[in-house]
């Protein structure tokens, strides 16, 4: 592609060279420099890649995009373009390179502090129940047409994002659904992408600190940018930050929640539990009337489901598809049931800190199990405060705990468990627990000692597929391991 085509829609100044320069691909990692490529110099939080421009020129790149002036004396044969913001420019250039695929699909973006992953999965399930072909991007990776790829960030860098959109389109997807993080918005990863629907789940202080957001107000402001880049905003009317977040919005609004003014309002829910189902049922009023059953527990599941329902309504999907999609939705590693016995209920969840653990156990306690049992550990080479906190919460809220490993990395599991034990003793000196350092043995123990009506939560790893010991990662898929053991012992 000619550089002139690549720069379409990007304000720039040609410093030297020609816009007729042929560009084979865009890079922003100087280690990938090679002839025919364009290197984008980015001013990052840790370093400024303008420092690598000369090295890239020496390796034969055809063009450079710069944000501030650099010494060009040693690179006379390289075309150089100057822009005001190289991250923003790279986003638009990447879209041009891949043929602006986002313009050819229905685009849905979901933002919020909590619930993004679950809500996107619910929306995907509803869309697919209606026959839509969906590509999804988020915390759990990239999914489309039966394929899965991991991603480093909730919202990938703009080049990878546009490349993924192209893959979605080429594979036959008609809809792209993604989690949109505040970092993704602030760092221009989604610049140039216009959404048909933007979804807001909720907001609480998070991602505030060095390299992230300076204040909660800044964090909220960046979240709100999504609603200046979409046609319809589907928003949680009950959240106290909704009004401030929507300041300056340019989209039409559709609301959900419990407030009487909500377009889609939940008017009471009940908890449902069997050995292979843990969820909620509720009635929706407002712009429409519908009874909904969701295969995920807790109050937040109601809100996430309302958001997905509202998206379905905005898109004009059949009620049957919305109902079926919500009823069948399962999120890997997020309160994921493993139905191996009719006697007890066992589930996997990614809860790996004090806040998420307390939230999960509060949700599960509401189902009034015979015993609430927790299998957990804490990661090595991480804050000890997390160990004390999780230990304290489990001691207070669980009837029985099984302390074990969780990615020890380069620490001894015995030392990690000792820290957890300290938190347990603080939370409840009479707490009942057992220490089983090997996680597989801990899973077997949980199954072997399960009682009728128990609810067993295996937490910390969730969707992870490995165990990290001494920096060596080996396969560890908890769902498969539990299913294999149940079959091995003839569990019913």
Predicted regions and their residues:
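Acidic, Mg2+-coordinating active-site environments of NTP-dependent enzymes
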Residues: 9, 70-76, 171, 196-346, ...
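N-terminal leader/targeting and accessory segments in enzymes
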Residues: 1-92, 269-270, 293, 297-299, ...
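Non-catalytic positions within long, well-ordered alpha-helices that form the structural scaffold/packing
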Residues: 53-58, 169, 191, 365
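ATP-dependent carboxylate-amine ligase
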Residues: 1-14, 35-38, 51, 250, ...
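Short glycine-rich anion-binding loops that position phosphate/pyrophosphate groups of nucleotides
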Residues: 44-46, 182-183, 204-207, 239-240, ...
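Phosphate-binding loop of NTP-binding sites
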Residues: 10, 89-237, 241-249, 306, ...
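Short internal beta-strands
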Residues: 62-68, 233-237, 375-376, 399-406
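Structural beta-sheet core signal
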Residues: 136, 178, 198, 235, ...
């Amino acid at each position: 592609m000619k550089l002139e085509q690549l720069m379409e829609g990007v304000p720039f100044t040609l410093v030297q060279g020609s816009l007729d320069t042929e560009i084979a691909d865009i890079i922003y990692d100087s280690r990938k420099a090679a002839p025919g490529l364009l290197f984008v110099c980015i001013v990052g939080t840790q370093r400024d890649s303008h420092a690598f421009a000369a090295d890239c020129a020496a390796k034969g790149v055809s063009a450079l995009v710069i944000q501030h002036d650099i010494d060009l004396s040693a690179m006379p044969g390289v075309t150089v373009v100057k822009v005001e913001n190289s991250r923003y420019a790279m986003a638009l250039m990447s879209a041009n390179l891949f043929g602006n695929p986002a313009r050819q699909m229905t685009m849905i973006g979901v933002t919020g502090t909590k619930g993004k992953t679950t809500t996107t999965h619910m929306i995907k399930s509803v869309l697919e129940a209606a026959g839509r072909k969906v590509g999804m991007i988020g915390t759990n990776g990239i999914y489309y047409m039966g394929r899965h790829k991991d991603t480093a960030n909730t919202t990938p860098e703009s080049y990878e994002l546009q490349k993924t959109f192209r893959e979605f389109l080429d594979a036959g997807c008609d809809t792209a659904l993604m989690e949109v993080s505040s970092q993704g918005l602030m760092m221009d990863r989604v610049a140039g992408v216009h959404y048909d629907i933007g979804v807001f789940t909720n907001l609480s202080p998070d991602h505030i600190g060095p390299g992230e957001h300076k204040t909660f107000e800044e964090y909220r402001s960046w979240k709100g940018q999504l609603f200046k880049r979409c046609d319809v905003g589907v928003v949680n009317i009950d959240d106290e930050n909704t009004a401030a977040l929507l300041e300056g919005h340019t989209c039409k609004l559709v609301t959900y929640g419990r407030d009487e003014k909500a377009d889609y309002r939940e008017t009471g829910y009940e908890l449902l539990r069997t050995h292979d189902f843990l969820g909620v049922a509720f009635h929706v009023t407002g712009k429409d009337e519908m009874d909904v059953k969701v295969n995920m527990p807790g109050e937040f599941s109601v809100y996430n489901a309302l958001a997905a329902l509202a998206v379905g309504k905005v898109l004009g999907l059949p009620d049957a598809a919305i109902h079926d999609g919500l009823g069948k939705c399962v999120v890997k590693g997020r309160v994921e049931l493993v139905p191996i016995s009719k006697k007890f209920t066992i589930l996997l969840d990614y809860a790996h800190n004090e806040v998420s653990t307390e939230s999960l156990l509060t949700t599960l306690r509401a189902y009034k199990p015979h015993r609430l049992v927790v299998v957990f550990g804490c990661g090595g080479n991480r804050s000890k405060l997390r160990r004390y906190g999780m230990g304290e919460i489990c001691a207070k809220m669980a009837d029985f705990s099984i302390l074990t490993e969780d990615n020890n990395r380069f620490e001894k599991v015995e030392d990690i468990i000792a820290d957890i034990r300290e938190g347990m003793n603080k939370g409840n000196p009479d707490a009942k627990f057992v220490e089983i350092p090997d996680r597989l043995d801990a899973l077997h123990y949980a199954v072997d000692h399960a009682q009728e009506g128990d609810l067993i939560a295996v937490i910390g790893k969730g969707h992870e597929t490995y165990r990290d010991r001494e920096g060596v990662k080996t396969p560890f898929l908890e769902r498969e391991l539990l299913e294999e053991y149940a079959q091995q012992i003839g569990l019913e």
